[in-house]
Amino acid sequence: MSEQESRDNAAVDAVRQKYGFGFSWLVLMIALPPLVYYLWICVTYYQGELVFTSDAAAWRRFWSHVAPPTWHAAGLYAAWFLGQAALQVWAPGPTVQGMKLPDGSRLDYRMNGIFSFLFTLAVVFGLVTMGWLDATVLYDQLGPLLTVVNIFTFVFAGFLYFWGLNGKQWERPTGRPFYDYFMGTALNPRIGSLDLKLFCEARPGMIFWLLMNLSMAAKQYELHGTVTVPMLLVVGFQSFYLIDYFIHEEAVLTTWDIKHEKFGWMLCWGDLVWLPFTYTLQAQYLVHHTHDLPVWGIIAIVALNLAGYAIFRGANIQKHHFRRDPNRIVWGKPAKYIKTKQGSLLLTSGWWGIARHMNYFGDLMIALSWCLPAAFGSPIPYFHIVYFTILLLHREKRDDAMCLAKYGEDWLQYRKKVPWRIVPKIY
Ligand SMILES: NC(=O)c1ccc[n+]([C@@H]2O[C@H](COP(=O)([O-])OP(=O)(O)OC[C@H]3O[C@@H](n4cnc5c(N)ncnc54)[C@H](OP(=O)(O)O)[C@@H]3O)[C@@H](O)[C@H]2O)c1
């Protein structure tokens, strides 16, 4: 490992310690699963009302909605998970190399997300039209599925914990078993060519999210004889986001999760439970709420989504292209940048000259456009934007600390040149 690489690894470790979870990891592991149940129960049985009561009997009634696992849900999920794993391993797609590991080696990854995504949609569509699968099954089985996937992830994380105990030198567990169970012990656990972290990060959770949305739309149609404009907006926006994700799938290889985070309960549960079951809250809510939107409202929400997308994708692609070719023209002029002592270039024009994370800003605009179609009858569809804002604020701080540790003076110079973190003139 070069001197530079060991400095980078030391910076990652330092930042991880500062922006890690402290002791809150235990609280998260205990509190988050009930929170997902809570939101689902509020949306499904209480018309989206946030239930708070001091009446113990009312709470007992509330929690009695937690659904036990069923063989039906377990069978569905097993078929789903194994089917997606088979696609990850065997579906056609280019093989690309991941980022350098701490020992200097690189892993191969099969980038077949878009094929798997479209193939899955075609198969599900075929099964539904032939009458072998009910279009509303994911809505009807949502409660049992939530329990099944929760149980699965807790067990799977146990498997991952033991898997990593004999891992590489840089993967040594901390010796605090519950913490290691939460954070994971292996960076890239693999069964044959199946990279479990990359697979769970994208496939069984993200494609499931889209299918759940479609199932919600089908249920709305079954119950009310219509699929409303707000439902079409939510399903359309989120489908577009997912297609875009799979088209640019390779970008996931440079994310913090793939580069630095071990694969334990946190990522596993986040990918398989949190993502599909909370990112569908808007569609879940709309199943029982068939309000319309004024035309100006629809235009404003679509405009917000498209503007957010243009910023989010524009900023990410601009950085990607610039890092490959610093002589590129950015917004009609030669790119301006700071050359760091480490040799990395920091773009200071285009989106990266307006704020240091315009890509987060664009992502937040998109997230808000997913919530607004639900109108203002319940706070639950807005849960996503609240959570996502907290997530990205935390990420920005962590990334800033990481870049400061890596680039020192050069980063301070960039911060001076581009003072806004995420939102120009505001934050
Ligand atoms: N939907 C979700 O759940 C979710 C969650 C998280 C993130 N995201 C999205 O994923 C996308 C990527 O996010 P990310 O967290 O990986 O952050 P990012 O902004 O894509 O990457 C930050 C890294 O880029 C480099 N960099 C920073 N400033 C630069 C500049 N001016 N010029 C060139 N390089 C610069 C630095 O790394 P090096 O110098 O070391 O290369 C820095 O660590 C974002 O659009 C974000 O909104 C989505």
UniProtKB/Swiss-Prot annotation:
Major location, coarse class?
A: membrane
| Mutagenesis or variant effect for residue 352 to A | Loss of catalytic activity
Give, from the UniProt record, the effect of changing residue 407 to A: Loss of catalytic activity
UniProt record similarity statement: Belongs to the ERG4/ERG24 family.
Q: Where in the cell is it found?
A: Cell inner membrane
Ranges facing Cytoplasmic side = 1-25, 92-110, 163-197, 248-262, 313-356, 400-427
Q: Give me the reactions it catalyses.
A: 4,4-dimethyl-5alpha-cholesta-8,24-dien-3beta-ol + NADP(+) = 4,4-dimethyl-5alpha-cholesta-8,14,24-trien-3beta-ol + NADPH + H(+)
Q: Which sites bind NADP(+)?
A: 319, 323, 347, 352, 359-360, 399, 403-407, 414
Under which name does UniProt file this protein?
A: Delta(14)-sterol reductase
The kind of enzyme this is, by top-level EC class, is: oxidoreductase
What does altering residue 395 to A do?
Answer: Loss of catalytic activity
Segments spanning the bilayer are 26-46, 71-91, 111-131, 142-162, 198-218, 227-247, 263-283, 292-312, 357-377, 379-399
- EC code(s) of this entry: 1.3.1.70
List the membrane topology term(s). Multi-pass membrane protein
Q: What broad taxonomic lineage does this protein's source fall under?
A: Bacteria, Pseudomonadati, Pseudomonadota, Gammaproteobacteria, Methylococcales
Biological process terms from the Gene Ontology for this record are:
ergosterol biosynthetic process; sterol biosynthetic process
Q: Keyword Heme, does the record have it?
A: no
Tell me what happens on changing residue 241 to F. Loss of catalytic activity
Source organism of this protein record: Methylotuvimicrobium alcaliphilum (strain DSM 19304 / NCIMB 14124 / VKM B-2133 / 20Z) (Methylomicrobium alcaliphilum)
**Record's keyword terms, sorted:** Cell inner membrane, Cell membrane, Lipid biosynthesis, Lipid metabolism, Membrane, NADP, Nucleotide-binding, Oxidoreductase, Steroid biosynthesis, Steroid metabolism, Sterol biosynthesis, Sterol metabolism, Transmembrane, Transmembrane helix
Residue ranges annotated as Periplasmic topological domain? 47-70, 132-141, 219-226, 284-291, 378
Q: Could you tell me what this protein does?
A: Reduces the C14=C15 double bond of 4,4-dimethyl-cholesta-8,14,24-trienol to produce 4,4-dimethyl-cholesta-8,24-dienol. Complements the deletion of the Delta(14)-sterol reductase gene ERG24 in yeast.
Identify the metabolic or biological route this protein is part of: Steroid biosynthesis; zymosterol biosynthesis; zymosterol from lanosterol
Q: Which GO terms describe its cellular component?
A: plasma membrane
